[in-house]
A protein has these predicted regions:
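Residue-level detector of conserved, function-critical positions
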Residues: 1-290
Length: 290
């Protein structure tokens, strides 16, 4: 199903454009695990693909379902619910996040740790920063440097980088230096540098390609590299995104003159640059604005 907005209310259509769930929500989010988060007023709940309310809009905050559970908040307290809306886990924390690979990130004070699906803290809050697990590892911050832990909490890649991103397709982005002038590259899951820090910006791999920027934020150009760091689509775009279903949306021009189209993994133009706003292809369709 695809989200639509009509007269400030949101709902869903199918691939033929037929309305499946009328636009009756103040805010609707994409379906995850067959349920969609919705908002009415200041409260969140969940609906199924028939539009039936599964969890009434009663929570101040919700994370969305992941691995069958969603973190929710009411009256200043976080807990987890299952897809029937039943409470499954109580947790004492300042913030709770979705489950990934069997563990969920929590924030206690200023530190981050992880709980399991029984609500037991298995990695105690000790990191100044942390993200969700991906491919068996989570990026964490100790002091002012970033590294990775495994599912048992062991530091498997020491915190030596100024920034890192999640592992994707076996590689993780790292940065040496600050956000403005630092250089970016890739490491493998042992911490070995596969692509040295040489680009002005890089993004995680998707479908065997990673988006890179050569040049500064204002004047740089975007292209794509393979997993050895070889440029396979030369930096030529003023903006670009990752690949989805074999296509990536790319743009040339600035401001109101910017137009978006789509290229394949070889950089061949498949859809000419003509749109003012693009989105990823999902199940063969992409939402665009003319």
């Amino acid at each position: 199903l695809y989200k639509i907005r009509v007269e400030r209310k949101e709902g869903f259509i199918n691939k033929t454009g037929a309305v499946v769930i009328p636009s009756s929500f103040d805010k609707a989010y994409n379906f995850k695990e067959d349920l969609a988060k919705i908002k009415n007023g200041s409260r969140y709940g969940f609906i199924n693909k028939s539009g039936k309310t599964v969890v009434p809009a009663q929570y101040a905050k919700v994370s969305g379902f992941s691995e069958g559970l969603s973190a929710v908040k009411n009256d200043g307290k976080w807990f987890y619910i299952d897809k029937t809306g039943a409470k499954t886990i109580d947790v004492v924390c300042n913030f709770a996040y979705p489950f990934h690979e069997g563990l969920a990130r929590i924030q206690v004070g200023t530190l981050f740790g992880f709980i399991n699906t029984s609500g037991i803290i298995v990695i105690k809050p000790q990191f100044e920063g942390a993200y969700d697990f991906s491919e068996g590892k989570a990026r964490v911050k100790k002091g002012d440097k970033w590294g990775f832990i495994d599912l048992k909490g062991a530091l498997v890649i020491k915190p030596t980088y100024d920034f890192v991103r999640d592992f994707s397709e076996g590689l993780a982005v790292f940065r040496v230096g600050n956000e403005r002038t630092g250089k970016w590259g890739f490491i493998d899951n042992t911490g070995k540098v596969i692509v040295k820090a040489q680009f002005d910006k890089v993004f995680p791999f998707s479908e065997g390609r990673a988006l890179v920027r050569v040049g500064d934020f204002k004047n740089g150009k975007f292209g794509y590299v393979d997993k050895m760091g070889k440029i396979v689509v030369k930096p030529q775009f003023d903006s670009a995104y990752h690949f989805s279903e074999g296509l990536a949306n790319v743009a040339v021009g600035v401001g109101s003159d910017r137009k978006w189209g789509y290229v394949d993994v070889a950089g061949k133009v498949v859809v000419a640059k003509q749109f003012s706003k693009p989105s990823d292809f999902i199940n063969g369709l992409a939402l665009v604005r003319i």
